């Protein structure tokens, strides 16, 4: 019997998915042995019992069984351990006064505990360490759990708010597009009508343009207000009633390393460089997508990119 057949067969009752397509497998976090739902109901319905796997002496309870999420039981076990440990060791960077070094040491300690529990290293000592920390920090753990729940609620509210605003924005943009199309059609007809009584074409066109400009729709004004609301999204700056500090990221000039408008022009389509010309003939370069015009373009970009870049002005606009 190959591994795929074993995967779809209950090791206790030997029923497989070929005969029972609706069969579900369950696992228990005590030992992570896979058992079909029928066997779980049959063996554990009267109360706790020993795991039916040969050589396993773990006592299992019916209410502890759950559906396996990951194909790899090792991954399933690690995820459960992480969930359990992080419910106890739930400090955040703010609890360390934003001291990254102290927070990193704390995370390293947590990872050591997870590793020991996952690999069965010093189990008694590690479990005792976990229990001791939980008893000594009950209030902090509960406060962080409540804060975490509040952060999740705020995130969901923010998602809902942004979704509603973006939907309104799309509707307004569609309305503006339709109004602009109607204004263009009206302008064409109006120019033709006015030219029948006024021979000065430039004056007619200018008057029609002014009229169209004055027809600035209420939808456009609403769109501008909506964009302001999105930029000043209250859910982006507040977390659980506290002002969220803006992430400190390195400032990158040149529009984020992207020069959208090239600061140079090539007078000639081709530049003759003997070294580059020889590379274009080599198969290993051609196979990798080598192109001489990309090389020249990159060299010129690097040479001209910093020209006209005033850091102080870019900092103000960023």
Curated annotation (Swiss-Prot):
Single GO MF descriptor: cyclin-dependent protein serine/threonine kinase activator activity
Function noted in UniProt: Acts as a component of the general transcription and DNA repair factor IIH (TFIIH or factor B), which is essential for both basal and activated transcription, and is involved in nucleotide excision repair (NER) of damaged DNA. TFIIH as CTD kinase activity and DNA-dependent ATPase activity, and is essential for polymerase II transcription.
GO BP annotation list: nucleotide-excision repair; regulation of transcription by RNA polymerase II
GO CC annotations on file: transcription factor TFIIH holo complex
Compartment(s) of residence: Nucleus
Top-level taxonomic group: Eukaryota
Residue stretches spanning the membrane: none
The protein, known as: RNA polymerase II transcription factor B subunit 3
Annotated source species: Kluyveromyces lactis (strain ATCC 8585 / CBS 2359 / DSM 70799 / NBRC 1267 / NRRL Y-1140 / WM37) (Yeast)
Database matches in InterPro entries: Cdk-activating_kinase_MAT1_cen, MAT1/Tfb3, Znf_RING, Znf_RING/FYVE/PHD, Znf_RING_CS
Residue spans, zinc finger RING-type: 10-55
């Amino acid at each position: 019997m190959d591994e795929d057949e074993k995967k779809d067969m209950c090791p206790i009752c030997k029923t497989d998915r070929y005969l029972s397509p609706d069969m579900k497998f369950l696992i228990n976090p005590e030992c992570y042995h896979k058992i079909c739902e029928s066997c779980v109901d049959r063996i554990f319905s009267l109360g706790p019992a020993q795991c039916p796997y040969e050589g396993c002496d773990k006592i299992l309870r019916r209410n502890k069984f759950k559906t396996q999420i990951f194909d790899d039981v090792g991954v399933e076990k690690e995820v459960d351990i992480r969930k359990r440990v992080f419910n106890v060791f739930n400090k955040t960077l703010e609890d360390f006064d934003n001291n990254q070094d102290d927070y990193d040491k704390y995370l390293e300690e947590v990872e050591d505990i997870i590793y020991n529990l996952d690999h069965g290293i010093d189990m008694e000592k590690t479990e005792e360490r976990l229990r001791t920390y939980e008893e000594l920090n009950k209030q902090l753990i509960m406060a962080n759990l409540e804060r975490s729940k509040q952060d999740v609620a705020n995130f969901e509210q923010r998602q809902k708010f942004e979704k509603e605003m973006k939907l309104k924005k799309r509707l307004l943009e569609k309305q503006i597009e339709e109004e602009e199309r109607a204004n263009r059609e009206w302008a064409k007809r109006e120019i033709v009508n006015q030219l029948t009584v006024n021979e000065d074409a430039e004056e007619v066109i200018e008057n029609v343009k002014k009229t169209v400009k004055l027809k600035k729709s209420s939808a456009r004004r609403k769109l501008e207000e909506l964009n302001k609301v999105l930029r000043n999204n209250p859910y982006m700056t507040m977390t659980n009633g506290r002002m969220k500090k803006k992430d400190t990221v390195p400032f990158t000039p040149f529009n984020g390393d992207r020069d959208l408008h090239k600061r140079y022009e090539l007078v000639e389509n081709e530049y003759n460089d003997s070294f580059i010309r020889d590379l274009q003939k080599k198969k290993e370069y051609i196979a990798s997508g080598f192109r001489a015009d990309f090389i020249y373009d990159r060299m010129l970009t690097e040479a001209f990119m910093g020209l006209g870049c005033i850091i102080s002005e870019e900092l103000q606009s960023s």
